[in-house]
Amino acid sequence: MGKRKRILITGGAGFIGSCLAEKLIEDTENFVVIVDDLSTGDTNKLPDPSKDNWRFIKCDVNNYRDIAEVMLANHFDYVFHYAAFVGVQQTQANPNKVLHDIKGIDNIFNLSKNLSVKRVFFASSSEVYGEPVDLPQNEETTPLNSRIPYAVVKNVGEAYLRSFQKEYNMDYTIFRFFNTYGPRQSIDFVMSRFIEMALNNKPITIYGSGEQKRTFCYIDDNIEATTNAFKENLYINDVVNIGSDNEISILDLAKLVIKLTSSDSKIMFLPPLPEGDMFRRFPDISKMKSLLRRDLINLEEGIKKLLADTSFIIPVEK
């Protein structure tokens, strides 16, 4: 048996981070250390405890001493920096808390550089594109138009990685996530929120007219594409949109959720959000498709998969 790859996942008790961890520990040649401060993460999302090639450490990446202790003790080969303060309402209500994540970016990337990490993977966001100036949104040609603090922080993270590559030769891959959804997502996000409301026959609330268009990427497509980039050494020092190219309006999404849940929910319109609710988000996913090498899971199928496990949306009474 060769030397195990030592992998750090920050934010690994969150939705995407925990699914990534689960996938990476399927390979016994990987040893995964998951860190999370549990401010929004949940230990119930952590992998199977009977597997011996992972461990969890409660740690705040924005606290240098906390994360330095973990990284100095483990000398990681690869780092997935997925920790972030997330959720539309939360990030808009707490802009300074969002900006605090720049400390985590600085800590993780400087420690990675100093400890000769082979490659850093960064969870960026479609938010860096801002209100679209051209569609589909392409990694190379679409200008970035970040305005809200969350988008600015992601843009800062991307700029750090490009600068560190140029100056210190530290390799990276940036994933720009577009509305990933799945069973472990919290109800701070539109898909899980709509499903929670529909399953409880509560009114489904939509900000604005509902004509805003989005694409939704099922978690399995996200994880398969991103882990293939890791395993096969693809898109090094590059940016990859992770999303879907199937657009739907928020109003039509609400109607689809009502149909698939056989709900009695009515749709209720609220005033538009003050900022950050872009009218369209539509990624060019040519690179992602080259990583996935199969058809994406369609929206209806993905929602049905999510409905098969709603334990994080509707907690089971113990």
Task: Say what each PLM segment does.
Residues 62, 93, 100-103, 148, ...:
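Residue-level signal for the nucleotide or nucleotide-sugar donor/cofactor binding architecture
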Residues 222, 226, 242, 253, ...:
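Non-catalytic, hydrophobic alpha-helical segments
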Residues 209, 237-240, 248-254, 262-280:
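C-terminal "lid/loop" region of Rossmann-like NAD(P)-dependent oxidoreductases
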Residues 299-318:
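Amphipathic terminal alpha-helices
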Residues 190, 249-261, 302-306:
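PAPS/PAP-binding and catalytic site of the sulfotransferase fold
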Residues 155, 180-193, 200-202, 207, ...:
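Glycine/proline-rich active-site loop of Rossmann-fold NAD(P)-dependent oxidoreductases
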Residues 1-180, 309:
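N-terminal Rossmann-like NAD(P)+-binding domain of SDR-like oxidoreductases, especially those catalyzing
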Residues 156, 160, 164, 194, ...:
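Hydrophobic alpha-helix immediately C-terminal to the catalytic Tyr-X-X-X-Lys motif of short-chain
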